[in-house]
Amino acid sequence: MSGSKSPRGEFAGRKLRLKRKWCRWHDYNYVRRVLKLKEKYDPLEGAPMARGIVIEKVGLEAKQPNSAIRKCVRVQLIKNGRVVTAFCPGNHAINFIDEHDEVIIEGIGGPKGPRAKGDIPGVKYKVIMVGRNSLRELVRGRQEKIKR
């Protein structure tokens, strides 16, 4: 008779349930969800976006085989004081962002949380708004930055 690892029979329900409960801990996504690891270690604390203050502008070198200096900014988040690096997408987008500006950042990547963008090592966030203006609209010339 071929052996089955799962108990089979009329009264095997409890054993099956306990085994399923034990085996779930080998599932990466289950562990992350139950222990709330995203909220614990994510600088955005599980939120889709966050506000922050620009500390400095930085240029990061792209990984091989590309050769470029990607324009990024260091941002201190208002909600928890953590400092993250955010990418500035678009041609000359860095020129619309000054130090001490308030920006809104969001994660780069998909549903599994922020992932590093393309050839920029360690940058998991991008700037989407500067002050009350969309960075994309500023780059396209449809809006002008409000001077205070």
UniProtKB/Swiss-Prot annotation:
PROSITE patterns membership: RIBOSOMAL_S12
Keyword RNA-binding set for record: yes
SUPFAM superfamilies found in the cross-reference section: Nucleic acid-binding proteins
Single Gene Ontology MF annotation: rRNA binding
Pfam families membership: Ribosom_S12_S23
Keywords: Ribonucleoprotein, Ribosomal protein, RNA-binding, rRNA-binding
Superkingdom per UniProt: Archaea
GO process annotations (BP): translation
Disulphide bridges, residue numbers: none
Subunit structure: Part of the 30S ribosomal subunit.
Family the UniProt entry places it in: Belongs to the universal ribosomal protein uS12 family.
Function: With S4 and S5 plays an important role in translational accuracy. Located at the interface of the 30S and 50S subunits.
Name of this chain's protein: Small ribosomal subunit protein uS12
Organism: Methanocaldococcus jannaschii (strain ATCC 43067 / DSM 2661 / JAL-1 / JCM 10045 / NBRC 100440) (Methanococcus jannaschii)
Gene: rps12
